[in-house]
């Protein structure tokens, strides 16, 4: 088995999907989890205005709507959380995503004050954060807020990780990578677009250039610039297609060096890091 085949198998990626079937699969997955653990009353998700959180948010709300109708349990809710750092450049996209999702509840937590306070505390301890590390601080502060909300609403935190993100480890460890349940896991980027199109999402929300937008020195830096490959390259690779050798090497290097992000904390029983 080639490394490409191993990666595809590990991430559960498929070369082709039926959008309607995958929508139903994700909704049923969320519903089944909530029904298995009836003490869970809410799904909590940060909404950025990008493709992934828009899709995950819509699926969460659909799952909650169906469960409420089927069970009569009106205590179930989907909580969409806006988590700007100061003023967000694409705020209108966030509002458009909220309008599309129609969440039960919307909360806004501006993380700038908390990030700056943490940065100052570290500075006083003799640690000056780089812009890159400050970006990770933002991602972790966002996740901290979501877990606080989930803790107070008997909820679980929903993630947006998918195959095209997992393969490169393009997420912050214990930031946006630290979630309870991931309904998009298995899909690549273009497949996520197919689901949103089938759901009637406004096109500008999934045709915009994806960006983590964590660095102050490089605001709205496109993911594809940071990664050195395009999402079309990544999707082709995940679909088992032949890609240029340099593209495959770049993708595989990302995968191998970020393996620790896709695993629990390393123990004495692990040996993947020795290979």
Swiss-Prot record:
Family membership, please give it: Belongs to the NAD synthetase family.
Provide the gene name from the record.
nadE
GO cellular component labels: cytoplasm
Q: Name one Pfam family in it.
A: NAD_synthase
Q: Which GO terms describe its biological process?
A: NAD biosynthetic process
Q: Would you tell me the protein name for this molecule?
A: NH(3)-dependent NAD(+) synthetase
HAMAP family given in the database record:
NadE_ammonia_dep (MF_00193)
Recorded source organism is Escherichia coli O6:H1 (strain CFT073 / ATCC 700928 / UPEC)
Q: How does it assemble?
A: Homodimer.
């Amino acid at each position: 088995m080639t490394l490409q085949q191993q990666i595809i198998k590990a991430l559960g990626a498929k070369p082709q999907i039926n959008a309607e079937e995958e929508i139903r699969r994700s909704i049923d997955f969320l519903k089944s989890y909530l029904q298995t653990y009836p003490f869970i009353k809410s799904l909590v998700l940060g909404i950025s205005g990008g493709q992934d959180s828009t899709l995950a948010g819509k699926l969460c709300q659909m799952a909650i709507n169906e469960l409420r109708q089927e069970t009569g349990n009106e205590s179930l809710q989907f909580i969409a959380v806006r988590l700007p750092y100061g003023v967000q450049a694409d705020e209108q996209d966030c509002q458009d995503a909220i309008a599309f999702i129609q969440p039960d509840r919307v909360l806004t937590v501006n993380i700038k004050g908390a990030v700056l306070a943490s940065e100052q505390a570290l500075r006083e301890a003799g640690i000056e954060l780089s812009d890159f590390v400050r970006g990770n601080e933002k991602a972790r502060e966002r996740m901290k807020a979501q877990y606080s909300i989930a803790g107070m609403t008997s909820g679980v935190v929903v993630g947006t990780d998918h195959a095209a993100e997992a393969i490169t480890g393009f997420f912050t460890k214990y930031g946006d990578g630290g979630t309870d349940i991931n309904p998009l896991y298995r899909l690549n980027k273009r497949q996520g677009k197919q689901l949103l199109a089938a759901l009637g999402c406004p096109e500008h929300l999934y045709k915009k250039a994806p960006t983590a937008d964590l660095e102050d020195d490089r605001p709205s830096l496109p993911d594809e610039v940071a990664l050195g490959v395009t999402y079309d390259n990544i999707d082709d690779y995940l679909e088992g297609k032949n890609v240029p050798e340099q593209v495959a090497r770049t993708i595989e290097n990302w995968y191998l060096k970020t393996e620790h992000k896709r695993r629990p904390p390393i123990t004495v029983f692990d040996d993947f890091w020795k290979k």
